[in-house]
């Protein structure tokens, strides 16, 4: 991972690896975190020079190999009572920001059959993501953040923002899963008369 493997702050996984592989997108420097701090600014605060990232690619002809010692972040080795393991593949990641937009309304006076509850659409997608991932070998998919607006106990949620993280060792399987999950989300939105944004 080298730096920022998970990419939580700027939603850019494998930042350091992308830099040394020559795959870093300069446009990512404009990404902002939850506090509005641009990636370029954060790199400067840590003593780095964001303008040098594009030229930091390592020459593969000068490398014999690479070994990285890493802790296991999951429970598999412990469950199998093993002290160490050898990585045979690294899962690629896809991340999405999804917004369901329905119609906010009074919780006490809006009949159930007249609601466009964005949270119900999001909840349905969360369960669909889990179901899809469970039936696909080695696929993991996670809705890690969810925020309902306006966020009052007496108001039907009119908008829900959520994140989706999809991972698999084979890019083709991961891409197919992302495509399928987007179609599922669109179907859910249509059935619930909600709008959906998938980024």
Language-model regions, residue ranges each:
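Acidic/histidine-rich catalytic neighborhood of metal-dependent amide-processing enzymes
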Residues: 1-84, 127-155, 162-165, 175
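Feature marks short, surface-exposed loop/turn motifs that line or immediately flank catalytic pockets
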Residues: 3-7, 104, 170
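Short, contiguous, pocket-lining structural segments
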Residues: 31, 35, 86-92, 110-121, ...
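Solvent-exposed residues in well-ordered beta-strands and their adjoining turns
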Residues: 72, 101-103, 167-169
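Acidic-glycine-rich active-site phosphate/pyrophosphate-binding loop
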Residues: 89-102
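Metal-dependent amide/peptide-bond hydrolase catalytic core
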Residues: 97, 108, 119-199
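Short small-residue beta-strand/loop micro-motif enriched in glycine and branched aliphatics
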Residues: 104-110
